[in-house]
């Protein structure tokens, strides 16, 4: 009479458990990335509301002809948020906010929101740099963009 499980049976069970754990972890990680992107979108909307109020008071989205106003929300969901591009050269009545992941290796996507509250998510961002190098990565240069649906 045999008692217990054979080595082959235990290995099969371990294999099945590891496959299920891998699938669950992948789904969890994607869920977290999606939640972080939604948090960044909410912060972009809050900053856009600030920009609209600023425009109502000052008659321009710019602080000066070459400078943007300071945004109230600078980081959310693992993304840093800045104005895209320099104020100089941007048409009056226009702005674009941009959210770039603090860890660009883990999250290469970029989220942009313009003055019309149109949000796009871009799959790739050209250029190197980090959130502290605002000149380089907040200029534009995004690729594979599509509307953001949340």
Region spans (language model):
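N-terminal alpha-helical signal peptides/signal-anchor transmembrane segments
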Residues: 31, 40-58
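Conserved hydrophobic beta-strand within the GNAT/NAT acetyltransferase core sheet
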Residues: 7-10, 51, 99
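N-terminal single-pass transmembrane signal-anchor helix
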Residues: 1-28
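Periplasmic/extracellular, small/polar-rich flexible segments of pilin-like filament-forming proteins
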Residues: 56-150
């Amino acid at each position: 009479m045999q008692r217990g499980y054979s080595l082959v049976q235990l290995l099969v069970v371990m294999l099945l458990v590891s496959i299920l754990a891998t699938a669950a972890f992948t789904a969890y990680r994607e869920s977290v990335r999606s939640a972080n992107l939604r948090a960044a979108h909410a912060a972009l909307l809050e900053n856009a509301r600030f920009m609209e109020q600023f425009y109502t008071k000052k008659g321009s989205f710019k602080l000066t002809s070459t400078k943007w106003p300071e945004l109230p929300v600078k980081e959310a969901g693992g993304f840093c948020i800045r104005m895209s591009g320099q104020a100089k050269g941007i048409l009056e009545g226009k702005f674009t906010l941009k959210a770039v992941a603090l860890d660009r290796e883990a999250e290469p996507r970029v989220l942009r929101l313009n003055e019309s509250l149109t949000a796009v998510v871009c799959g790739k961002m050209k250029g190197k740099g980090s959130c502290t190098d605002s000149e380089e990565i907040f200029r534009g240069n995004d690729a594979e963009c599509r509307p953001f649906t949340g």
